[in-house]
């Protein structure tokens, strides 16, 4: 091409680009054209949110309309009248309100798929712990210096001048009012006996109380016969809440017998396995449960390496039930994933390399550019299957891109995040932008027993009312249920079977719900 023609080409191309930019930026000539452009922009934005690809059936649309009617009224009443929006308030205050709503009742009835982020000592209700577990033989209690009750199963009473052990049965009988005693005991253990949002000024002070809960119950619930029944009760409660599948993080080590025998991790895994299999035989509609070994992030590097080796052995021996390894506990004051790097790399440096799945808690924090939120970098580089909490993920655009590219879902636990001090008003949850852009998200409940939440329905309700917009309801809820199967650690074959079971229950739920709404449909028509 000649120099002259090259210059002409460049000039023409420049003019075309300038003209196109001018046309794009030019003011719209009419209000109608402006509104058309505005609607198009809003629709394009909405098309990217979680659940936007779901196409509802006619029956589902009926149900969606009823949920949206209540949701919009609550939002509009609060926004226009400047009154408190209760679904986003402290769970301590909002729980009773939530329980009265139409949307919550629908969510309770709705098959929600799986709960993928749960911990072993807070999965069944405190009502069961108090009314069943503390009524067993050899259950003792003592009051510590803070007047908190500690519970243990004991054969021999240890001398302890700071916490004198007394038989619970005797204390209950001597109280003169069994119901009042049990109510007092439950309130003493429950994290919801006060409002954590106003009671605790910092995240650290919240965690002091949270860790106290585990100290109060571990000596009771780790007694092997009680743990067996406690886990069975948890499965009953999750199934009653229309949850079909769970993935449970458990320490596995330390279940004990009355004679002082302390069991290893394989015993703990087999306890869960036998109860799960028995439960599935009794309830074939229940998809199942699987276990993740959780180490504590204040342990030594040598202890974590030993746990990783045990996790490898369990994964080889029980590949269909044992999923992998995680590190749990408050991230801010404890060791980072990088601190344990040699231990966590151990499986990959074997010959041949062994792929031990990881399910790391990472960035459960409000801080930025610290070793805590940089746990995300290590979690992703160590090929974590999912990220627990991931509260600070949105602050790291490259981490966010990498996680989405690799299909690494975030396990969001909205009530837990509020109760543990990360967000007061759940509408301001850090991960709302990811939900608005259809990032891989699952909703779980973390430790529902500790704060008297339902197994999963309360968290689904809070997610519906606070984490997505005014015009979003059943598409969002349905996508969350589907995500819980898609991003579970089940095999591909298991996922196909799980989705089939879930679909059967979903279709039945929609039909039954719409049938129940028919009188109200007629009233509205």
Swiss-Prot record:
Catalysed reactions, semicolon-separated: adenosine + H2O + H(+) = inosine + NH4(+)
Gene3D superfamilies reported for this sequence: Metal-dependent hydrolases
Entry function: Adenosine deaminase that may contribute to the degradation of extracellular adenosine, a signaling molecule that controls a variety of cellular responses. May play a role in the regulation of cell proliferation.
Compartments where located: Secreted
Binding site for Zn(2+): 117, 119, 361, 446
The protein's name in its UniProt record: Adenosine deaminase AGSA
List of residues binding substrate: 120, 207-214, 329, 447
Glycosylated position list: 81, 132, 188, 334
Keywords: Disulfide bond, Glycoprotein, Hydrolase, Metal-binding, Secreted, Signal, Zinc
Signal peptide range: 1-25
Cystine crosslinks: 142-163
EC number: 3.5.4.4
UniProt cross-references to InterPro entries, sorted A to Z: A_deaminase_dom, A_deaminase_N, ADGF, Ado/ade_deaminase, Metal_Hydrolase
A Gene Ontology biological process term: adenosine catabolic process
Family the UniProt entry places it in: Belongs to the metallo-dependent hydrolases superfamily. Adenosine and AMP deaminases family. ADGF subfamily.
Source organism (scientific name): Aplysia californica
Principal EC category: hydrolase
């Amino acid at each position: 091409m000649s120099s002259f023609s090259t210059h002409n080409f460049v000039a023409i191309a420049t003019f075309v680009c300038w003209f196109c930019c001018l046309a794009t930026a030019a003011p719209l000539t009419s209000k109608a054209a402006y509104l058309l452009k505005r609607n198009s922009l809003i629709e394009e934005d909405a098309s990217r949110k979680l659940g936007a690809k779901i196409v509802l059936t006619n029956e589902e649309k009926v149900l969606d309309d009823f949920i949206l009617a209540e949701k919009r009224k609550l939002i509009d009443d609060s926004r226009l009248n400047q009154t408190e929006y209760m679904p986003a308030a402290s769970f301590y205050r909002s729980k009773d309100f939530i329980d009265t709503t139409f949307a919550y009742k629908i969510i309770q009835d709705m098959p929600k798929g799986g709960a993928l982020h749960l911990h072993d000592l807070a999965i069944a209700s405190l009502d069961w712990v108090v009314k069943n577990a503390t009524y067993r033989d050899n259950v003792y209690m003592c009051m510590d210096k803070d007047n908190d009750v500690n519970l243990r199963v004991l054969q021999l009473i240890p001398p302890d001048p700071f916490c004198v052990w007394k038989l619970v049965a005797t204390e209950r009988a001597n109280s003169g009012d069994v119901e009042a005693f049990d109510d007092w005991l439950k309130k003493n253990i429950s994290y919801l006996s006060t409002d954590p949002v106003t009671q605790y000024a910092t995240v650290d002070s919240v965690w002091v109380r949270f860790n106290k809960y585990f100290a109060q119950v571990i000596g009771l619930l780790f007694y092997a016969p009680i743990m067996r029944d406690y886990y069975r009760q948890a499965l009953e409660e999750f199934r009653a809440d229309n949850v079909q599948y769970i993935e449970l993080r458990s320490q596995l080590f330390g279940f004990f017998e009355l004679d002082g025998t302390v069991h290893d991790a394989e015993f703990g895994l087999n306890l869960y396995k036998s109860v799960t299999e028995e439960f599935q035989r009794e309830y074939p509609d229940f998809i199942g449960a699987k276990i993740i070994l959780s180490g504590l992030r204040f342990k030594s590097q040598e202890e974590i390496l030993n746990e990783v080796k045990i996790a490898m052995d369990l994964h080889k021996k029980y590949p269909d039930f044992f999923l992998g390894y995680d590190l749990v506990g408050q991230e801010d004051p404890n060791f980072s994933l990088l601190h344990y790097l040699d231990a966590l790399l151990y499986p990959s440096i074997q010959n041949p390399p062994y792929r031990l799945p990881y399910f790391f808690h990472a960035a459960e924090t409000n801080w930025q550019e610290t070793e805590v939120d940089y746990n995300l970098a290590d979690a992703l580089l160590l090929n974590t299957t999912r990220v627990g909490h991931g509260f600070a993920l949105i602050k790291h655009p490259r981490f966010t891109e990498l996680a989405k590219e690799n299909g690494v879902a975030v396990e969001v636990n909205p009530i837990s995040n509020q109760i543990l001090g990360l967000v007061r008003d759940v509408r301001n949850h850090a991960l709302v932008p990811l939900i608005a852009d259809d990032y891989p998200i699952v909703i779980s409940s973390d430790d529902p027993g500790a704060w008297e939440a339902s197994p999963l329905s309360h968290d689904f309700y809070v997610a519906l009312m606070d984490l997505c917009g005014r015009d979003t309801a059943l598409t969002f809820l349905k996508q969350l249920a589907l995500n819980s199967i898609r991003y579970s650690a089940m095999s591909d074959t298991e996922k196909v079977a799980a989705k089939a079971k879930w679909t059967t229950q979903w279709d039945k739920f929609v039909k039954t719900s719409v049938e129940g709404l028919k009188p109200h449909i007629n009233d509205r028509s």
